[in-house]
């Protein structure tokens, strides 16, 4: 704009000088020279107007392009925000924290079995689970190092004072290793981790539960089916300090998740078993989710049958039906 103003000022100065000269010729009676100057001024004025229109057109085009770019940037920002919400874009998240396991709140969780003295069979259940990447490629294998934290709580919200009946805490550290198998592209990752799980209770009431595991897992995606097997080894404890010596008998050494991921819904099946023909123990959990608002918030139904839903109930058979909302899968 500054250049255009200077250019227009120069044109006005030249135009005024020529006009003064034409008027002098006209006073002297030399109408021919005066008309030539008037004609010249008319042509200059026309060219200035054309130039100004072109500049205005150019500015309008630039402004329109700017608006278009801003619109595209806004659309890109929306896509980044959505990708971040789904945990697909860590660069958008300044803390690098993303969802890990399911995050849900189930205000209606009904147990068909007794939950102990003074406990209501109806309660709420919720889970929070996050992870953060620490490092990557330290060994030159494109591996990634994570810490994660999962907390699952069973909350007696329908009782007076609404106490928490049980809360399980799971801090863990794991490494994701990529696998480069040309003939098995759907099998392309391996996870190795160490997991601590406890309910944070003291020994004085004999309700303390904890154990430590080393595990190996993988995730196999084929079309819309996701298969996640996991094997673990319990780190041995001193018998005097072991709060739950028989936990492997009820929890086994593995679990398997098989999911179908639709466009607006998912179905997940979890199986766990001790693989013993005599005195067989295990658990099954079925998860159903439907994106009712098309915004990533799912109506969620959970059915559990077996042992080990929580650490305090690891050796008790429970059958439970729960429903509520899920915000990440």
Show where each model-derived region lies.
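Conserved, mostly hydrophobic/aromatic
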Residues: 130, 301
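Glycine/small-residue-rich hydrophobic helix-like segments
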Residues: 266-292, 297
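Cleavable N-terminal export/targeting peptides
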Residues: 1-79
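Outer-membrane beta-barrel "beta-signal"
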Residues: 318-329
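Outer-membrane pore/translocation modules
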Residues: 25, 96-117, 121, 135-263, ...
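Gly/Thr-rich phosphate-binding loop signature of adenosyl cofactor/nucleotide-binding cores
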Residues: 126
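Basic/polar, acidic-poor N-terminal "presequence/leader" segments
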Residues: 52-122
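A cross-kingdom marker for long, charged
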Residues: 38, 42, 298-300, 307-311, ...
């Amino acid at each position: 704009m500054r250049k255009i103003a200077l250019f227009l000022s120069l044109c006005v100065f030249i135009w005024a000088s020529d006009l003064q000269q034409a008027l002098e010729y006209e006073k002297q009676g030399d109408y021919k020279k005066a008309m030539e100057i008037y004609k010249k001024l008319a042509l200059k004025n026309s060219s200035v107007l054309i130039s100004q229109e072109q500049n205005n057109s150019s500015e309008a085009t630039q402004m329109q392009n700017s608006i278009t770019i801003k619109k595209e940037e806004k659309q890109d920002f929306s896509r980044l925000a959505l990708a971040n919400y789904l945990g697909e874009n860590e660069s958008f998240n300044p803390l690098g924290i993303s969802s890990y396991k399911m995050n849900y709140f189930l205000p209606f969780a009904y147990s068909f079995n007794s939950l102990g003295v003074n406990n209501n069979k109806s309660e709420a259940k919720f889970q929070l689970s996050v992870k953060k990447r620490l490092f990557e490629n330290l060994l030159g294998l494109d591996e990634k190092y994570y810490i994660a934290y999962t907390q699952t709580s069973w909350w007696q919200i329908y009782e007076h004072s609404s106490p928490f009946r049980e809360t399980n805490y799971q801090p863990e550290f794991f490494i994701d290793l990529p696998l480069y198998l040309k003939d098995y592209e759907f099998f392309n990752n391996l996870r190795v981790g160490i997991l601590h799980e406890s309910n944070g209770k003291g020994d004085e009431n004999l309700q303390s539960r904890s154990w430590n595991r080393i595990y190996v897992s993988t995730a196999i995606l084929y079309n819309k089916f996701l298969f996640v097997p996991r094997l673990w080894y319990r780190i041995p404890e001193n018998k005097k300090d072991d709060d739950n010596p028989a936990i492997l008998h009820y929890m086994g050494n593995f679990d398997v998740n098989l999911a179908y991921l639709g466009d607006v819904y998912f179905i997940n099946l979890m199986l766990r078993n001790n693989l013993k023909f005599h005195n067989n123990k295990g658990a099954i959990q079925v998860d159903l989710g439907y994106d009712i608002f098309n915004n990533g918030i799912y109506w969620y139904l959970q059915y559990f049958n077996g042992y080990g839903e929580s650490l305090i109930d690891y050796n008790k058979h429970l059958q439970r039906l729960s429903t509520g909302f899920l915000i990440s899968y």
